[in-house]
A protein has these predicted regions:
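Extreme N-terminal starter segment of soluble prokaryotic enzymes
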Residues: 1-5
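Phosphate-binding/switch loop-helix module in NTP-utilizing enzymes
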Residues: 78-121, 128
Length: 239
């Protein structure tokens, strides 16, 4: 099984961009990739249906990527609040069922979280219960800030204590020409202090948008995809 759960620790870390980019790369390499967003808050009301902005971005990169969301709420807040206002309680069995269907149709499925691992989904379950139930490894997306290392350590340690399988960390929005020793040392600090592997570095992009080809190239060159999926990818030898 080559499926992973992608989550963030700090806000605006860009996990949707990373998730979509990895899926687009794998699709371009000839694999059938999927992105599953179990819970989408801030969905767009199109009248007859709700539209997931995150999955729309995925489709913009590659329309052939399989996508799905089980629960969608227009309110842009934590799922626990959104589902109470929307009168739809989040059930891990529903998520597990949809996950199994999607996993059977794809070569690899990237499951993207809403919020962090400790985000409450209802009175008794948190986001970390999703990868725990699905039995898939977790990848953290973080931005380089030594001021937040304590938060990163606490989040990763909490995940380990919960029994989650941690695949590693992807550092997003990393300055290409970092002149700060603190920023330069950030990847090593994460590996040594948090005892977790850095799977890749993705640079900062100017503006709020990124071209598909640019993102695919950045992912190919910046992330160890074989470590992400824990598999050999023969076509990568040609890049």
């Amino acid at each position: 099984m080559n499926n992973v759960f992608i989550t963030g620790i700090n806000s605006n870390c860009g996990k949707t961009v990373i998730t979509a980019g990895i899926a687009a790369v794998m699709q371009s390499l000839g694999y059938k990739a999927g992105v599953y967003k179990p819970i989408q808050s801030g969905a767009i009301d199109k009248g007859k249906y709700l539209l997931s902005p995150d999955l729309t971005f995925v489709k913009m990169l590659d329309p052939y990527i399989t996508t799905h969301s089980t629960y969608m709420y227009t309110e842009k807040t934590i799922p626990y609040v959104a589902c109470k206002n929307g009168n739809a309680n989040i059930d891990l069995q529903d998520i597990s069922k949809d996950y199994s269907i999607l996993a059977s149709k794809t070569d690899m499925l990237l499951v993207e979280s809403t919020g962090g691992l400790m985000t409450p989904l209802n009175k008794s379950i948190y986001t970390y219960h999703i990868p725990l139930t699905l039995k898939i490894p977790v990848i953290f997306v973080v931005t380089p800030s030594n001021d937040n290392v304590d938060n990163y350590f606490n989040a990763i340690n909490t995940a380990k204590t919960a029994g989650l399988d941690i695949a590693g960390v992807i550092i997003n929005k990393y300055p290409v020409y970092a002149d700060s020793n603190e920023i330069k040392s950030f990847p090593t600090l994460i590996e040594n202090y948090c005892d977790i592997k850095v799977l890749g570095l993705i640079r900062s992009f100017k503006g709020n948008s990124v071209q598909s080809n640019t993102l695919i190239s950045e992912i190919l060159n910046g992330i160890d995809l074989e470590d992400v999926f824990r598999m050999k990818i023969p076509k990568l030898n040609g890049y």
